[in-house]
């Protein structure tokens, strides 16, 4: 750090300069006496053993150059963040700069997830004939975490009305939102619908979306209740449009938007115009741009659907598309994960 006045008439004679008198050493972020009002990068200077200094010929010094005065990082009264913002690591740094070590935040909604079905076994248990692995608890738990909720996953509940009611009441007592998974249709053992109809007020049952049409929305004890269909893709779609929206509403944040690209359809496909249709897609990239291979969860491609890198939700009124049509698809892993060729 130097005194800019010494450079008023160009490069001064520095052969007799002394540290602490004509200049001081200062690392990035250091404070130094106010008399030294400019900084020259050390890469542009040579400090001799006797303390004198020489500067590169191209050094120019103006008052305040290289110096950040006190208060320049943040001005008194300047807003740091807006309400409803999600606090990122960089936001924490800005808050600390302003001395805000404690800020009010919205509490993450506790979402109870009750998996139901006598045919289900926990993940990690080899299923016998007639049994299915409970994959939805794992999937929906981490979807809810992505959405900003605090999931509370209950143990598996058999298709037993008494056992189901016990779990449902426990969930209502401890959570802000209750999700019952399975039993949302009108089958012989679909007890969930009857329980929710008796215990709460049904807002809507059967929606214009496939897969997942039997989804039910209700309110019980003033809390949102969702009966999420059991099939994996149906549970996923219901989580995406319904559970995510409920969580965002409670948190007061907008719905997230994934990156969207236009991709060529590799085959013609029909959809139900009266329904929103979700399709999982594998997107690749070639010399002509993006290509979309649509997967069919009903044709033995369920695992591939779950690990695909994109998806598309067909809007209401769309009857399908032809091979080669350019379609908007959502990237689920980011553009950097799209395969080449």
Regions from the PLM with identified roles:
Residues 66-180:
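Phosphate-binding glycine-rich loops and their immediate beta-loop-alpha structural context
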Residues 74, 197-341:
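Flexible glycine/proline-rich
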Residues 29-30, 118-119, 183-186, 231-232:
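Short glycine-rich anion-binding loops that position phosphate/pyrophosphate groups of nucleotides
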Residues 25-27, 56, 82, 113-116, ...:
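Short beta-strand segments
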Residues 10, 15-18, 32-34, 46-48, ...:
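Solvent-exposed alpha-helices and their adjacent loops that cap or buttress functional pockets
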């Amino acid at each position: 750090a130097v005194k800019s006045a010494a450079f008023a008439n160009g490069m001064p004679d520095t052969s007799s300069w002394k540290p602490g008198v004509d200049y001081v050493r200062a690392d990035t972020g250091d404070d130094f006496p106010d008399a030294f009002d400019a900084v020259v990068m050390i890469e542009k200077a040579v400090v001799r053993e006797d303390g004198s200094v020489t500067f590169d010929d191209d050094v120019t010094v103006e008052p305040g150059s290289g110096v950040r005065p006190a208060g320049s990082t943040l001005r008194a009264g300047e807003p740091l963040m807006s309400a409803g913002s999600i606090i990122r690591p960089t936001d924490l740094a800005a808050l600390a700069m302003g001395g805000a070590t404690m800020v009010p935040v919205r509490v993450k909604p506790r979402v109870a997830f009750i998996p139901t079905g006598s045919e289900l076994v926990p993940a990690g248990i080899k299923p016998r004939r007639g049994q299915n692995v409970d994959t939805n608890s794992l999937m929906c738990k981490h979807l809810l975490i992505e959405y900003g909720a605090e999931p509370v996953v209950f143990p598996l509940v058999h298709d037993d009305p008494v056992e189901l009611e016990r779990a449902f009441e426990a969930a209502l007592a401890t959570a802000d939102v209750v999700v019952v998974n399975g039993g949302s249709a009108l089958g012989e053992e679909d007890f969930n619908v009857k329980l929710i109809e008796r215990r709460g007020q049904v807002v809507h049952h059967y929606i214009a979306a496939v897969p997942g049409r039997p989804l039910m929305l209700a309110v019980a004890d003033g809390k949102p209740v969702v009966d999420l269909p059991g099939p994996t893709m149906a549970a996923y779609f219901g989580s995406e449009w319904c559970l995510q929206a409920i969580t965002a509403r409670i948190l007061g944040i907008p719905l997230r938007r994934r990156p969207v690209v236009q991709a060529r359809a590799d085959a013609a496909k029909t959809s139900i115009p009266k329904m929103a249709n979700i399709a999982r897609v594998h997107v690749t990239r070639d010399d002509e741009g993006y290509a979309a291979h649509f997967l069919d969860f009903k044709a033995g491609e369920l695992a591939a659907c779950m690990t695909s890198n994109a998806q598309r939700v067909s809007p209401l009124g769309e009857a399908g598309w032809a091979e080669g049509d350019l379609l908007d698809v959502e990237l689920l892993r980011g553009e950097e994960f799209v395969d080449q060729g």
